[in-house]
Curated annotation (Swiss-Prot):
Stated name of the protein: Cysteine-rich receptor-like protein kinase 45
PROSITE patterns: PROTEIN_KINASE_ATP, PROTEIN_KINASE_DOM, PROTEIN_KINASE_ST
Reactions the enzyme catalyzes: L-seryl-[protein] + ATP = O-phospho-L-seryl-[protein] + ADP + H(+); L-threonyl-[protein] + ATP = O-phospho-L-threonyl-[protein] + ADP + H(+)
Subunit structure: Interacts with CRK36.
GO MF: ATP binding; protein serine kinase activity; protein serine/threonine kinase activity
Uppermost EC category: transferase
Length: 351
């Protein structure tokens, strides 16, 4: 293995736009096969490939994502993740150690996260019972700090486009790290939104304005983050197989004055009154994040301020009269067949 420059090895045809790149290893395929015992321990899978656990000769545990298919689209997503992660470093983002390319095989090598993804934790009754509110709050706050870095502090103004519990990994201390940058895109400084040619993301977490207009912005991530908060607190899926959405359920509870019913029963029974008040505040903030009007949504910096300053009053959530956008839109796939577990792509029809 040799330490190699990302642009020199993968993107020779691209002009170098910045000197602030993070160097990492280019692994040869034999090294990856040896580290993963010939890809014997599958620890995850998604719309972009399979993830295997491995161990390098120095003892470091790694996770290796191998693209499931080779196509122009998947290669573009592979290159996109490499280029973006080569410029990013934050304690709440996954640490990319290197990559491997050989013929039609493409792999990314990450640090290994022993507690898997957040969705595996909160949607498993046994593991979810181990999470008290303090742990959940720290996870939520960590995700928000990672998003603030992407949106405001990295200098790239990155929109992730697929924030969800499945793209949040937990380390040994349950500290969250954002992963899944295949669909991410950068914005120009001062750019409020960018036109896209296709809708990408995960059912239940997709920004309604993004779906309607094809324009993506950092507020699209704020929307998905709001759904993620509600998923953590309720331990419910964003989209159930019967076609009901978590957002609709939470709004019904809020309108009836029964927001406490959103809190998972184990947490509701075990937490003290002060903690319950704090959880209800987080539900309130989440509802502001999932406002159907992107302009009314807070930016992530304001969300973090609301988290840390309990005395700051919150505006009332605004619920439109429209049905959720997933019900308004004639999707080429059924949401009930893909309830928040895999990323989906839909072309934007001409308007």
């Amino acid at each position: 293995m040799a330490v190699t420059s990302l642009l020199d090895t993968v993107f020779r045809r691209r002009k170098k736009k910045s000197t602030e790149f993070i160097s990492f290893f280019e692994f040869d395929l034999d090294t990856i096969k040896a580290a993963t015992n010939d890809f014997s321990e599958l620890v995850g899978r998604g719309g972009f490939g399979f993830v295997y656990k491995g161990r390098l000769q120095n003892g470091q545990e790694i996770a290796v994502k191998i693209l499931s298919t080779s196509s122009i689209r998947t290669e573009r997503q592979f290159h996109n993740e490499l280029i973006i992660l080569s410029k990013l470093k934050h304690k709440n983002l996954i640490n990319l150690l290197g990559f491997c390319t050989k013929r039609d095989q493409h792999g990314l090598v990450y640090e290994f996260m022993p507690n898997s993804s957040l969705d595996c934790f909160i949607l498993d009754p046994h593991r979810a019972a181990q999470l008290n509110w303090e742990m959940c709050r720290n996870i939520i706050d960590g995700i928000a700090r990672g998003l603030r870095y992407l949106h405001e502090e990295s200098g790239l103004w990155v929109v992730h486009r697929d924030i969800k519990p499945g793209n949040i990994l937990l380390d040994s201390d349950l500290k969250p790290k954002i992963v899944g940058f295949e669909l991410a895109r950068t914005m120009q400084q001062g750019e409020n939104a960018a036109e896209t040619t296709e809708i990408v993301g995960t059912v239940g977490y997709l920004d309604p304005e993004y779906i309607r207009s094809g324009r993506v912005s950092v507020k699209s991530d704020v929307y998905a983050f709001g759904v993620t908060i509600l998923t953590i607190i309720s331990r419910r899926k964003a989209w159930s197989v019967d076609g009901d959405s978590l957002i609709k359920y939470v709004r019904r509870c809020w309108n009836r004055g029964e927001a406490i019913d959103v809190i998972h029963e184990v947490m509701r029974e075990e937490e003290r009154e002060y903690s319950i008040s704090e959880i209800l505040r987080y539900i309130h903030i989440a509802l502001l994040c999932v406002d159907e009007n992107a302009e009314r949504r807070p930016n992530i910096d304001k969300v973090l301020h609301w988290f840390s300053c309990f005395s700051t009053p919150l505006p009332d959530p605004t619920f439109g009269n429209r049905f959720l956008v997933e019900e308004e839109t004639n999707w080429p796939w059924s949401p009930s067949l893909s309830p928040g577990h895999s990323s989906v792509t839909s072309p934007i029809s001409s308007r």
